Amino acid sequence: MEQHRLCYISRNYYNLTSAGNKAKTDNEDTLMEMGAANLGLHRTVHDSKILAFFLDLAGIIRTCFLLRKGDVLFLQYPVKKYFSFLCDVARRKGAKTVSLIHDLGSFRRKKLSIQKEISRLSHSDYIIASNENMKSWLLAHGLEKPIGSLGLFDYRSLSFHEPQASSSDTTLNPTIVYAGALSMRKNSFLVELTKSLSAWSLTIVGNKEGLRGLEDNPHVTYRGFLPSEEFISHVDADFGLVWDGDSLDTCSGEYGNYLRLNSPHKVSFNLRAGLPVIVWKESAVAPIIKKYGCGIAVGSLKELDNILPRLSQEDYSDMQERARQMAMRLNQGYFLKEALRIATSSM
């Protein structure tokens, strides 16, 4: 089989802490580990929009000169302004493009029509959807390009949480942690949860000033903001919760509905900390969590009042070990490597 040179384009990032930027830079690190060639400039971190524009433009121009016939150019979609252009340049030079979707602007933010997004994606030779649900959605809406799926976004970190052995039964008083940016638009369900929670304990990691109406509850602990590396190495919880919207009974609203299609970076973040995750059963990641046995999928958070007491210590320990194994996979770039192996084997 003909050997193709795998290439990518590093760029400027405004920061390395946001979920989107972290996922992209982790992928760049995996590509570098795989021996891929960076045709752009070295990765930079500047918050100046003007400087970022010229740095990214210089990287794009450099790529156009260095790209060769037979290359496979890996793109992280969306690529601001240059996606269709890069795909067309690659085609004219006899190279192929493989594009990993991080976000669909037509589904959540409605920044463009579905037809326009499908048309834009169709410039690429091969698409890697975030997961199988997104893959099915794209095919149902007219995408005719070869397509695979990622599953979960990898999560690389220097830190790793090594759970301490305990003589107590975790299932008697489980603690669930919810970490992330807090806002009424994204996770107001937490307000309702603090009013009614009594069967288990909740730790909220984030700036609670973003949520109005949070109530004092002996079962709820507020930790404030924690850097990601500190969270991963020191989190004291039994499960990580991934839930969006304003309801305890379902994931609703703009962010909640998007869970049907995307693979939240928060899932990978919690798993990297060695935490089994609790996810919505209608989310795109639920089948993955079930497949690997590293968490629980529920239709409503109210179900936890019955599920958690019935979870034996043996079952929890097995789930925790599977989460630990998943943490190692995520740190090694397993999901991207596998998706790229499948993509390039078809070229």
Summary of predicted features, one role per range:
Residues M1-F85, K93, E282-V285:
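N-terminal pre-catalytic "stem/leader" segment of glycosyltransferase-like enzymes
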